C-alpha cells in the first residue's frame, strides 16, 4: 500500500497556520511514517538538502524505516556539474543518519526515471524484511576480525572477543553479537562491523540494528559454613587416662 502524505512544512509555517490545518497535516504525515515500512523523502534538486529534510531523515532512522531519497527536478540540473553518482554521494553525506538510503534522480515533469522509484521502494522493503543464515553472518564476521581485530582496552591487557553473531529480527534487520564484554568495543569498531555486513551482504535502503551482549558476570561463590565443633570422646580426660594396676608397685 502506498500513502502519499502532504509536504511537511517548516515549524514556523505550521505555527502561523490560523486554522490549524498545517498541524493536522503534519500529524497525519507522522502517523503515516510510523505505519510505513519504507519512507520516501523527496528533495528538490535545485534547492538541495534542507534542514527540514535533515530532521525528517533523522526521524526515519530513529523509527527504523527503510528509506528511498528521490531527487526531483533532475532535468533542471547542469549535467556538466552533477552526475547521478555525485548527487547520490552528496545527498548521503548530508543526510548522515540515512547514509545507507537508496537515491533515485527523477523528473516528475517529464516522467523520467519515475518507475525507478517504485523499484527502489520494493527492493528496500525486501531488504528491510531480509533474513541471513547464521553461517553466512559468522563467515563475514570471521573475515572482518581477521582483517581488523578488536582493539585492546587502553591501560589494560583486556581485549574484545566476539564469539559469534546471529540475526534476532527484521524490519529492520537486527543482529546480536555475543562478546566477552560489550564495553571493550568502541563505536568506531562497531561501525566497522556494520560496514562489513553491508559490503558483503548488502541491505541497500535499509537500516541495521546491532546489539552487543556480554557474558554474564559470575557471582562469587559463597564459602561453605565451617563444620560445627563436636565434643571429643573419653580420651580427653585429665591425666591422659588411667595408670595400669601394677605400674606403681615398689620392689621388695
Whereabouts are the PLM-identified features?
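C-terminal-of-GTPase-core extension/linker across diverse P-loop GTPases
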Residues: 1-3, 7-16, 20-27, 31, ...
Amino acid at each position: 500500500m502506498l500513502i502519499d502524505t502532504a509536504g511537511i512544512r517548516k515549524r514556523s509555517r505550521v505555527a502561523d497556520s490560523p486554522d490549524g490545518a498545517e498541524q493536522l497535516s503534519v500529524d497525519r504525515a507522522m502517523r503515516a511514517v510510523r505505519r510505513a515500512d519504507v519512507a520516501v523523502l523527496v528533495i528538490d534538486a535545485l534547492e538541495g538538502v534542507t534542514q527540514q529534510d535533515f530532521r525528517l531523515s533523522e526521524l526515519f532512522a530513529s523509527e527504523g524505516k527503510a528509506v528511498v531519497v528521490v531527487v526531483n527536478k533532475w532535468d533542471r540540473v547542469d549535467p556538466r556539474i552533477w552526475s547521478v553518482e555525485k548527487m547520490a554521494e552528496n545527498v548521503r553525506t548530508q543526510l548522515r543518519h540515512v547514509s545507507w538510503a537508496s537515491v533515485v534522480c527523477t523528473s516528475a515533469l517529464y516522467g523520467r526515471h519515475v518507475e525507478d522509484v517504485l523499484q527502489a521502494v520494493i527492493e528496500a522493503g525486501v531488504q528491510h524484511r531480509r533474513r541471513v543464515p547464521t553461517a553466512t553472518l559468522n563467515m563475514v564476521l570471521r573475515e572482518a576480525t581477521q582483517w581488523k581485530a578488536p582493539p585492546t582496552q587502553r591501560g589494560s591487557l583486556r581485549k574484545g572477543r566476539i564469539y559469534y553473531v546471529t540475526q534476532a529480527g527484521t524490519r529492520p534487520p537486527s543482529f546480536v553479537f555475543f562478546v566477552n564484554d560489550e564495553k571493550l568495543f568502541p563505536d568506531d569498531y562497531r561501525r566497522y562491523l556494520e560496514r562489513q555486513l553491508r559490503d558483503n551482504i548488502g541491505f541497500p535502503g535499509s537500516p541495521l540494528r546491532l546489539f552487543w551482549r556480554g557474558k554474564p558476570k559470575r557471582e562469587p561463590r559463597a564459602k561453605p559454613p565451617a563444620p560445627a565443633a563436636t565434643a571429643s570422646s573419653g580420651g580427653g580426660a585429665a591425666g591422659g587416662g588411667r595408670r595400669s594396676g601394677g605400674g606403681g608397685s615398689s620392689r621388695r
